[in-house]
Amino acid sequence: HVWRMDMKLDAKFNGVIFKVKDGTIVPDDEYMVFLAKDNAFAAILPIYREKCAEMGADIEHLAAVDRTIDRLRDWRELNYALNKLKA
């Protein structure tokens, strides 16, 4: 399937996503969802943070990613039985 401008970007999940900073709705064609239980996602999030730093992301964005990494780690430790693709 080829993505088109009139298609929802994330074909697996549905919902309404709001930006925390201003309460605006993020359009369906601008977001994707990854679950905390996904081991592949957990493994690449620190790499995403490194890439953001390399590309000049501001301190606020990097701090937000750091908080996300911390929350993800904590959730995964507390919910180990739910984690997918166990090594």
Feature locations, PLM:
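Short intrinsically disordered terminal tails
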Residues: H1-M7, N79-A87
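N-terminal acidic leader/helix
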Residues: W3-F41
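Amphipathic alpha-helical packing elements
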Residues: Y31-Y80
